Amino acid sequence: MNDKYFSRVELEELLEDFCLKASSEGFSGIVSIVGGAAMLLAYESSRAQTTDIDALYPHNKALEKVIFNISEERGIQKNWINGAVEEFVPYGVENAWVHYKDIYGITVRVASAELLLAMKLAAGRPRKDFPD
């Protein structure tokens, strides 16, 4: 399956679905979003779409099942939300997160503009990240 590109509206729908199903599994924590999805959701950006939601969230069987089920229901890539970026998120950065919204008892926050810039610079991908 080719990766699907998601617009801002589609990202909001995916987050709504994820939070509804995750809360029904007893999850009530925090989901922290970085990368292109954070830029689409919270900032004025020339970016119109992204292929995934790079996020920090607890990895457990219940949430992984929710993610898998949503991918099956919607016919999208299985890694539509993933934590692959976790090792690249610097910890201890002051004001690193901005509250986005609360959805079904789950706090969704996005990386601050400063954190996004720091991560883009650290990634060292000028061709890919320059438009951002």
Q: Where on the chain are the PLM-derived regions?
A:
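Compositionally biased terminal segments of proteins
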Residues: 1-132
